[in-house]
Curated annotation (Swiss-Prot):
A zinc finger (C4-type) spans 19-37. GO terms for molecular function: rRNA binding; structural constituent of ribosome; zinc ion binding. Binds 1 zinc ion per subunit. Residues 21-31 have a biased composition (Basic residues). Keywords: Metal-binding, Ribonucleoprotein, Ribosomal protein, RNA-binding, rRNA-binding, Zinc, Zinc-finger. It comes from Encephalitozoon cuniculi (strain GB-M1) (Microsporidian parasite). Belongs to the eukaryotic ribosomal protein eL37 family. Residues 21-59 are annotated as: Disordered. InterPro entries: Ribosomal_eL37, Ribosomal_eL37/eL43, Ribosomal_zn-bd. The lineage of its organism: Eukaryota, Fungi, Fungi incertae sedis, Microsporidia, Unikaryonidae. The keyword Heme does not apply. This is Large ribosomal subunit protein eL37. One of its GO terms (biological process) is translation.
């Protein structure tokens, strides 16, 4: 069997699947580990460089919860119904 173009056509099985912890397509089925977050190790895998850390830090995704919290904090949590009821009691 040759080791060139002909053998590359046979590489059609998938080795990676979605990771349970980080959700990326980097969980290797044969190695049973995620190349992105290090799952199943209890500690998260540390990205090597500062640039890589910047890519995956807080503020790079959708930030559904944080966006709402930052806006509410800026306005003094005036629109929060739970806090409004607490202030009404006092």
């Amino acid at each position: 069997m040759s080791k060139g173009t002909a053998s590359f056509g046979k590489k059609n099985k998938r080795n990676t699947e979605m990771c349970r912890r980080c959700g990326r397509q980097s969980y290797h089925k044969q190695k049973n580990s995620c190349s992105s977050c290090g799952y199943p190790n209890p500690k998260m895998r540390n990205p090597g460089s500062i640039k890589a850390r910047r890519r995956r830090t807080i503020g790079t995704g959708r930030m559904r919860y944080m966006k709402r919290e930052l806006r509410a904090a800026k306005n003094g949590h005036k629109g929060d119904p739970i806090l409004r009821t607490l202030w009404a009691k006092n």
